Amino acid sequence: MEFDTIAAISTPMGEGAIAIVRLSGDEAVAIADKIFKSPGGKSLTTKDSHTIHYGHLVDPKTNEVVEEVMLSLMRGPKTFTREDVVEINCHGGLVSVNRVLQLALTNGARLAEPGEFTKRAFLNGRIDLSQAEAVMDLIRAKTDRAMNVALGQMDGKLSRLIGDLRQALLETLAQVEVNIDYPEYDDVEEMTVPVLVEKCTWVRDEIIKLLQTSSQGKILREGLSTVILGRPNVGKSSLLNSLVQENKAIVTDIAGTTRDIIEEYVNVRGVPLRLVDTAGIRETEDIVERIGVERSREALRGADLILFVLNYADELTAEDERLFETIEAMDYIVIINKTDLPQKINLARVKELAGKHRIVTTSLLQEEGVTELEEAIAALFFEGQIEAGDLTYVSNARHIALLHQAQATVEDAIAAAQAGVPVDMVQIDVTRTWELLGEIIGDTVQESLINQLFSQFCLGK
């Protein structure tokens, strides 16, 4: 497949030690050769692949020196895109990197679209669609475990499993074709039905195993949606600041200071938390605060974990007890804050209301109890769930939806075969399952979906 030559800045914009401008395509080396001058004056076209060269970029129209650079030359197909690739390392300033990019564009390259380098890797057969999506997961990973899951998917872990499932279905379809081609032989159909049921059952079971990892995989990918809950002025914002280790929320003695929800990502002992500091949930006449309270209720409904904060120096109120009832069926940790003040809270009643849920005492003002809280969060998350590093996790919402559809169609095939439906009719569901699994890795997917997926990538990737 032939494409034009593209170029883009592949590093984040801003000031830094270096920046990289990447070119990919049949003319990448020729374009670079027009603008690159080495001390020895030798052409890049004579250089070996996978080599690095020092020199200057020079505008061929004016002979003006634009930048001092290191240039990496890599010839296809042993590159990310399977095309000729040139990466120009220049100084990391906004003006510098933009001048380098403009020089490449005015000498024959086209500005790359978002995700176009990865899209070319997919279209040229270097990676499949699930591996391409894993590239973005790797970039966005917020913990080591999330990064390891993305690396496993990039390495083809999920692709190989999906390939095995599709191969089993293909073998089943081949057996069905034999039955269709030789309908006069009853024993052929008698052999076909058990094989079909056996292989489809194995495929279904493997799909179910994958889907069982989806909740953990989604958390690793997107973070554990964690709501900080409690009455106003019990220390919710102080807790957010302690976990994030920055002053993201206003901390005052005035109840109701947090009028809106505040979100922040934080890595707590390998657990990615998407922390939401809510406005205190209470009845209020203040219109602005009431909007914040309603948003807090919405956040609560979508939470994976609740950090329920109580005040050690206050008696339990009817509002506290109502909040216990609200979160009764959810995963939560009770945090009794302000232990540096005289005790007024009834600890026995808190234990009774919390039941089996963990209780941690803290004095966030004195920075006490935060370590114990982090340990409690990690213990809750990792308890028998996610320690097995050899699991293949599925976390992408598109993959999960396709797996659910594939499970439904393969179960229809099993039920139909067992009910005595002719195998040529059962074949329809088996084929549809094969197609749905193919959409995960991009074998059976529409071009419009491919374009949409890659448009979500950043420029230069």
Curated annotation (Swiss-Prot):
It is found in: Cytoplasm. The keyword Nucleotide-binding applies. InterPro entries: G_TrmE, GTP-bd, GTP-bd_TrmE_N, GTPase_MnmE, MnmE_dom2, MnmE_helical, P-loop_NTPase, Small_GTP-bd. Its main location: cytoplasm. Mg(2+) binds at S237, T258. Its cofactor is K(+). Exhibits a very high intrinsic GTPase hydrolysis rate. Involved in the addition of a carboxymethylaminomethyl (cmnm) group at the wobble position (U34) of certain tRNAs, forming tRNA-cmnm(5)s(2)U34. This is tRNA modification GTPase MnmE. It comes from Lysinibacillus sphaericus (strain C3-41).
